Amino acid sequence: MIEFECSCDMKKHRAPLEGCEISSGALEKIPQILADYSKIYVVADENTYAAAGKRVEEILKAAGKHHRTLVLDGETVLPNVETLGKIILFANDPLAKSNIFEYSPMPDFILAVGSGTVNDSCRLASYRLRLP
């Protein structure tokens, strides 16, 4: 939880943020950052998957983290009900029940790899699903 003072009428603001990593090589720190989570749901769009999402999958696999990835298709991903619906529906993927790793169909962490639209959509989905 972060908390900060502000000059607005609310005076104090809070956000349920566990941490933030801004550094060179931040992708390589993902296993340490997500040490408390075992089922990672990675969400990216086509562009951000090519830029970093594929590497994130490799890092999670090397760290022994169970994960699955949703790549939102299309030239432009919009922050709308369709995008949110895809994220939430895939989080509950019934096919995951047959995963040989006994991956529960519900992840315990949503990892957004991407742009403002991907991040904002994942933030709302995680709120709706009560996931970090």
Give the positions of each predicted feature:
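ATP/NTP phosphate-donor binding region
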Residues: 1-109
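A short, small-residue-rich loop immediately preceding and capping a beta-strand
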Residues: 94-132
